[in-house]
């Protein structure tokens, strides 16, 4: 009996859900070249505009000269270098916590944290719109796993009443496909009332949120007691790559001992840590980046509402335009691309059926003129959806 892979692939195509990889032929930034076509991009997560910053590049180059280009071993063997340690200390300072621990990527950080903290006989409660890495972590932990209604503390409280063993409540800080933020004060209160821990993956909050860019916990003025487990990624606002978990001394030591995705993998290149240290410095000192980004978000929302687009409840750089049908979302993405703009159509299973959307993401590297070009193109293209049949573009 053979694997019938062709049938699975054909079904994806028929449902307008087939994915292909655009080939980026330039550095990240607002102006990119994709598959040979110059485009103005509104689809990366480089919120602070640091991915191609000359000082960050120079820090990476200097780090490679000093430390080489490979981690060489796992952290627990001989792969934990001085730049890694300095970056962990800087991230602990940013988050106001005693310790931080580096991971190679956000998926591994989430998987490592959840599976190290709970297992058989315990409970994991997750927002139903959490990132796939969090949902996978909950399922793989072996703990009793269930999802509460999106951002609904009443639903969470009902699940908490039925929890057993150690209970971990897990939520995104900023929800990556909707752009809305978790009601952390209410979630923290509900968790603490039942002796549960709250874990927040703030991948999209670090940078845009908080007075110093320290994310949603800083935005709400919460403490480590409110959010014992805080996860962040470095490949978005920091402009580099990797992830971290920040928390108490006991939490970090527990992860070092029990988080398998941390233990059984080679450390990231030390030069990458050098680059991230520089981007962290820029993030903390160049406050104009957050201010400029906030003004772009306001400009886009005002313009989109005037056009009559259906936006979602978001004041973050993630500004989804709800379309509904996957084919229509693909068509609008294609129409924009024909006008030199790159905005990705997001379809099931990434989002629920019937909620396909264009996911606009804004960056401090964008200009007001860039956003105006996008708004003008949307005003021209959106009415055309009803005038033509859905067709699948080359890349979506």
Swiss-Prot record:
Record-stated family: Belongs to the class-II pyridoxal-phosphate-dependent aminotransferase family. BioF subfamily.
Annotated PROSITE patterns: AA_TRANSFER_CLASS_2 (PS00599)
Subunit field text: Homodimer.
Protein's recorded name: 8-amino-7-oxononanoate synthase
Positions where N6-(pyridoxal phosphate)lysine occurs in the chain: 236
SUPFAM superfamilies assigned to the protein according to its UniProt record, in alphabetical order: PLP-dependent transferases (SSF53383)
Residues binding pyridoxal 5'-phosphate: 106-107, 176, 204, 233
Recorded name of the encoding gene: bioF
Organism of derivation: Pseudomonas savastanoi pv. phaseolicola (strain 1448A / Race 6) (Pseudomonas syringae pv. phaseolicola (strain 1448A / Race 6))
One GO term of the biological process aspect: biotin biosynthetic process
Top-rank taxon, per record: Bacteria
Function of the protein: Catalyzes the decarboxylative condensation of pimeloyl-[acyl-carrier protein] and L-alanine to produce 8-amino-7-oxononanoate (AON), [acyl-carrier protein], and carbon dioxide.
């Amino acid at each position: 009996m053979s694997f019938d892979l062709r049938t699975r692939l054909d079904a994806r195509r028929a449902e307008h859900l087939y994915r292909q990889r655009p080939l980026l032929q330039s550095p990240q930034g607002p102006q990119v070249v994709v598959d040979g076509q110059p485009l103005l991009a509104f689809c990366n997560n480089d919120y602070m505009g640091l991915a191609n910053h000359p000082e960050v590049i120079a820090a990476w180059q200097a780090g490679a000269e000093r430390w080489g280009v490979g981690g060489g071993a796992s952290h627990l063997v001989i792969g934990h270098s001085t730049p890694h340690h300095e970056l962990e200390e800087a991230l602990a300072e940013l988050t106001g916590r005693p310790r931080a621990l580096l991971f190679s990527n956000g998926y591994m950080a989430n998987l490592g944290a959840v599976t190290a903290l709970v297992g058989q006989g315990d409970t994991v409660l997750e927002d139903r719109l959490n990132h796939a890495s969090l949902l996978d972590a909950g399922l793989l932990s072996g703990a009793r796993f269930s999802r509460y209604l999106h951002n609904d503390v009443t639903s969470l409280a009902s699940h908490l009443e039925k929890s057993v063993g150690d209970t971990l409540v897990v939520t995104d800080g900023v929800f990556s496909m909707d752009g809305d933020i978790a009601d952390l004060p209410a979630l923290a209160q509900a968790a603490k009332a039942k002796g549960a821990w709250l874990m927040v993956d703030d991948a999209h909050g670090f940078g845009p949120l908080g007075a110093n860019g320290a994310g949603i916990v800083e935005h709400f003025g919460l403490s480590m007691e409110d959010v014992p487990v805080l996860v962040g990624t470095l490949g978005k606002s920091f402009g580099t790559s990797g992830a971290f978990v920040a928390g108490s001394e006991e939490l970090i030591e527990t992860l070092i001992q029990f988080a398998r995705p941390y233990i059984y993998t080679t450390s990231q290149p030390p030069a990458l840590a050098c680059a991230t240290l520089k981007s962290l410095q820029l993030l903390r000192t160049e406050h104009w980046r957050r201010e400029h980004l906030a003004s772009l978000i306001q400009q886009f929302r005002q313009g989109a509402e005037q056009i009559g687009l259906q936006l979602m409840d978001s004041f973050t750089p993630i500004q989804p335009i709800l379309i509904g049908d996957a084919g229509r979302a693909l068509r609008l993405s294609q129409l924009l691309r024909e006008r030199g703009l790159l905005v990705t159509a997001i379809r099931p299973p990434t989002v629920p059926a019937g909620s396909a959307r264009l996911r606009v993401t804004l960056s401090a590297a964008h200009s007001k003129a860039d956003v105006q070009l996008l708004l003008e193109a949307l005003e021209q293209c959106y009415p055309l959806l009803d005038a033509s049949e859905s067709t699948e573009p080359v890349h979506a």
